[in-house]
Amino acid sequence: WPSDKFMLGLVSFLIGHVFYISGLISGIEFSLSWQVWVPLIILGSGMFLGLRSGLGRMQLPVLLYILVILIMSGTAWERHFQLELPQTYFAVWGAALFILSDALLAWNRFRVKFKSAQLFILGTYYTAQWALAISLSQSAAEQVS
């Protein structure tokens, strides 16, 4: 195992986002509504361009990860717009907090280290996981009953 496990973590989280996409897309039609995807493309482009000079050999893996997390977020928004259920707000907030958590992590790793980074990264990360899990567990419970 390499001493720096960042790449292993990146791949693990990428796989996790694929599972979230699978859960979020169930029961809806995937669509490419511009209201969802144009802002996400702008956000993702800005994130990548802001990080690019510090990425070195990690440019392609980070770009792929950004694409997957944006697809997860877009799917959460599409779910919210199509189902209009209260729990879909949790999916949207969870996705937004996941993007924030990962942006803070990436900025801290590849650009500038900042004080209290772990507090902000983990605080947004755990809240994101909770919100996404709540949004999907409520949906699953309603589909069963």
PLM-predicted stretches and their roles:
Residues W1-S145:
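Polytopic alpha-helical membrane-helix bundles and their juxtamembrane interface segments
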